[in-house]
């Protein structure tokens, strides 16, 4: 009897293992998981198309409405190369005509080498503009890229002694009305108010904010807002792209 038990127990264990393997194989074949490439990509829920109505900053003063250009290929295996000189050289290279002055329309296209890239007028769902999700959702390159961003901030009056506060992943430079305001170099994570500009003046009416963000491997995003002398966010601004390009 003991001999039969010693023989039967291992056999039963083997049969039990085989039964589980067959069960799980049948389960997987009945409901195969969709491969990543089979899943339709979208920029939702991170972005939605900007409307013609002026948009105020969010509750903390962050600018969420931007014209974003699809990413320009700029291969980099590491973000450690993003020194002052490297980043400035990358952004001073002319990839498309009037890149430092153009105020595009939604849907405008530019030619960069063999890339045809479009501008998109979008509202970010978050305080930080998720460039990686923007590129991924449009089936564009996500690593080793440069993003250009433009927005138009309308001020109800002249505002003196304000500061532009920005954070980005990875390196970036930001301009206000054609003048460089802040620069962020090296391999860095996106941190709120990571770098703050010197005191500057917002004109009554239209002010053009322009930025360029470069990244190698990893996620890309940025956040931008204006703060006053006390470091408090300036909220009585609006962003409107309905006159972009005019």
Indicate residue ranges for each PLM-predicted region:
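Non-cytosolic beta-sheet module surface loops
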Residues: 155, 164-168, 213-215
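Accessory carbohydrate-binding/adhesion or oligomerization-edge regions at the termini
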Residues: 31-129, 211-246
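Aromatic-lined ligand-binding clefts that engage carbohydrates, nucleic acids, or primary amines
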Residues: 160-175, 209
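N-terminal secretory signal peptides that target proteins for export/translocation
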Residues: 1-13
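Beta-strand-rich ligand-recognition modules
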Residues: 176-225
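Short structured motifs
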Residues: 133-137, 148-150, 193-197
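Short beta-strands within extracellular/lumenal beta-sheet-rich domains
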Residues: 142-154
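Bacterial N-terminal signal peptides
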Residues: 13-29
């Amino acid at each position: 009897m003991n001999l039969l038990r010693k023989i039967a127990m291992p056999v039963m264990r083997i049969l039990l293992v085989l039964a589980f393997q067959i069960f799980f194989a049948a389960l997987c074949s009945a409901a195969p998981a969709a491969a990543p490439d089979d899943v339709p990509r979208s920029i939702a829920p991170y972005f939605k198309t900007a409307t013609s109505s002026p948009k105020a900053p969010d509750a903390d003063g962050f600018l969420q409405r931007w014209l974003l250009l699809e990413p320009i290929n700029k291969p980099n295996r590491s973000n450690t190369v993003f020194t002052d000189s490297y980043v400035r050289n990358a952004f001073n290279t002319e990839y498309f005509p009037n890149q430092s002055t153009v105020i595009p329309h939604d849907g405008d296209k530019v030619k960069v080498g063999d890339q045809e890239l479009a501008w998109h007028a979008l509202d970010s769902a978050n305080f930080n503009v998720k460039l990686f999700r923007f590129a991924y959702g449009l089936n564009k390159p996500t690593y080793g890229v440069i993003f250009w961003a433009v927005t138009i901030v309308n001020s109800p009056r002249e505002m003196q002694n304000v500061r532009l506060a920005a954070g980005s992943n990875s390196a970036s430079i930001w301009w206000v009305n054609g003048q460089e305001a802040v620069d962020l170099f090296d391999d860095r994570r996106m941190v709120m108010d990571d770098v703050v500009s010197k005191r500057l003046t917002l004109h009554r009416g239209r002010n053009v904010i322009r930025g360029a963000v470069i990244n190698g491997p990893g996620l890309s995003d940025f956040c931008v807002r204006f703060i006053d002398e006390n470091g408090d966010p300036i909220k009585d601004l609006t962003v409107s792209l309905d006159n972009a390009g005019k």
